[in-house]
């Protein structure tokens, strides 16, 4: 489902999907495409190269051959006053809900379950002024993700993702409760998640990720009042997350991401490999990370590691036992 304005400089207004039904795509084709054969990797390389060398968007025609570039299930492009309310989703080819360059909206009472490759729950990309509440996510990837475009295209669009609140949501399964990045080239600010739960197992509760190709900024991101079961990391910042791109394509231009103002407060977790791991970039260290009132039952590997971060404030961070 793709909703967008016909004119690039105009927005669709008051677009909505509501009701008690279920959106369930037929997955026969898409499940085959979850694999990454060589033609798919070559298509990714071609698309990345075109974007990095300023090939006009209209000339980036990729739906050919065996490229296997999967679509989002729900994609809103340049829409205003969006409402998503009350329905269920079962499975998705790629990101489940993608809100791209949208302004204003409410996402509530959704029951989302999708366990395929790249099945994020909801991705905000260069969007602003949204509330997400009372949703359940059961994902094959991250639950709630904040993005701001990749590299040259996002630098050109210069549209930060900002002013987003997520509350009273739960993630039943998935990689991350709140993910920031790694596509953050347009900048991210003013994100607040509170009163959410991850009762089972996740890789990370709060994950800030970027790399030396992204540029942009991340500032004023908050997590508060979260309860969790098991996690590899309660909080992680990693400034060199490249995944398959590391070897697939070269660095066309280096721009380090500015990260300033990451806050975690009142978080409990039954078991974690580590409480926090902060890996900044020596060329532009992360600044101002506050971690307070965090309680972990069992720590399995290490309590904390910090590199290239200025002004880490830790207060009342405790654990019951360390098991190695």
Where are these regions (language model features)?
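Glycine-rich beta-solenoid repeat tracts in large extracellular/virion proteins
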Residues: 6-10, 72-78, 95-101, 119-126, ...
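Single conserved hydrophobic/aromatic residue that forms the stacking wall/gate
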Residues: 1-15
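Low-complexity, glycine- and small/polar-enriched segments
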Residues: 47, 51, 262-264, 302, ...
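Beta-rich carbohydrate-recognition and catalytic domains
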Residues: 16, 27-28
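Right-handed parallel beta-helix
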Residues: 6-10, 14-22, 28-99, 103-114, 126-142, ...
């Amino acid at each position: 489902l793709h909703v967008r304005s016909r004119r690039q400089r105009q927005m669709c207004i008051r677009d909505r999907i509501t009701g008690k039904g279920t959106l369930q795509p037929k997955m026969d084709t898409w499940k085959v495409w979850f694999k990454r054969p060589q033609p798919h990797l070559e298509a990714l390389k071609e698309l990345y190269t075109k974007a990095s060398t300023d090939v006009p968007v209209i000339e980036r025609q990729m739906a050919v051959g065996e490229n296997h570039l999967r679509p989002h299930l729900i994609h809103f492009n340049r829409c205003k006053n969006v409402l998503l309310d009350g329905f269920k989703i079962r499975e998705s080819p790629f990101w489940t809900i993608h809100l791209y360059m949208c302004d204003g909206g409410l996402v509530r009472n959704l029951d989302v379950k999708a366990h395929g490759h790249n099945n994020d729950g909801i991705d905000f990309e260069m969007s602003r002024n949204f509330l997400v509440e009372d949703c359940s996510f059961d994902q094959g990837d991250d639950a709630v993700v904040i993005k701001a475009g990749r590299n040259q295209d996002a630098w050109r669009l210069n549209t930060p993702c900002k002013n987003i609140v997520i509350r009273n949501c739960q993630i039943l399964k998935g990689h991350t409760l709140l993910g920031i990045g790694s596509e953050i080239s347009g900048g991210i600010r003013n994100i607040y998640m509170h009163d959410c739960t991850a009762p089972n197992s996740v890789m990370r509760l709060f994950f800030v990720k970027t790399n030396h190709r992204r540029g942009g900024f991340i500032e004023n991101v908050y997590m508060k009042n979260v309860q969790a079961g098991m996690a590899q990391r309660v909080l992680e910042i990693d400034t060199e997350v490249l995944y398959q791109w590391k070897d697939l394509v070269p660095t066309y231009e280096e721009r380090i991401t500015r990260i300033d103002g990451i806050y975690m407060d009142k978080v409990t977790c039954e078991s974690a490999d580590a409480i926090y791991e902060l890996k900044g970039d020596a060329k532009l260290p992360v600044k101002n990370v506050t971690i307070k009132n965090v309680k972990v039952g069992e720590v399995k590997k290490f309590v904390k590691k910090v590199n290239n971060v200025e002004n880490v404030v830790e207060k009342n961070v405790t654990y019951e036992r360390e098991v190695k």
